[in-house]
Regions:
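Solvent-exposed, non-transmembrane regions of membrane-associated and secreted proteins
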Residues: 1-151
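C-terminal single-pass membrane-anchor helix
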Residues: 139-178
Length: 178
């Protein structure tokens, strides 16, 4: 398990796994080998793939409903990256030209078979990372976390000073009693 993808517009919340083998595609979204790991960064182009029309579960069945500007969130390593859809293309299965790296952009492409039930082509939805502005709730949580950290640090320092003073007092008492 690498992380999760969340596309609220089409009700997708799925796990992401590395590799494109059938066993991976049967349980979630596949991170295609030889593409950037989905952790973001300028010059990266991560490619994720999932089934359409799988008999037991809905994966990327509604990917074609995404429109330019729609958000895609990818959560990996306790960080959530937000991407905005910039393009939708239908290509032959062997056409990988849209998956190339752009050294000035942080890109994510989602691929699935198309059209539904025929699977003669691939639908590629490309998205570019957008900067996120912290919501007021996030800012309050960050400030609260900083205060908690300051309090814990202060408590540790106070305990350490008390331990040093107690050690000196015990040693002095032992010397006086000896």
């Amino acid at each position: 398990l690498i992380g999760y993808i969340d596309i609220s517009k089409i009700n997708v919340k799925l796990p992401i796994y590395h590799g494109d083998e059938d066993k991976v595609l049967e349980k979630g979204v596949a991170h295609l080998p030889n593409t950037a790991f989905p952790i973001g960064g300028v010059g990266n182009h991560s490619v994720l793939s999932a089934h359409t029309g799988y008999p037991t579960q809905v994966f990327f069945d509604n990917l074609n409903e995404l429109e330019i500007g729609d958000e895609i969130k990818v959560s990996v390593l306790d960080e959530t990256l937000t991407y905005a859809v910039t393009a939708k293309n239908i290509v032959k299965p062997d056409n990988i030209s849209l998956l190339s790296v752009d050294e000035e952009k942080d890109l994510l492409s989602l691929i699935t078979c198309y059209p539904y039930g025929v699977n003669s082509h691939r639908l590629i939805v490309t998205a570019e990372r957008v900067s996120e502005t912290a919501s007021p709730d996030t800012a309050i949580k960050a400030e609260t976390n900083n205060r908690s950290f300051d309090f814990i640090l202060l408590a540790i320092i106070a305990i350490a000073i008390t331990a040093v003073i107690a050690t000196f007092a015990v040693r002095k008492r032992r010397k006086n009693n000896a």
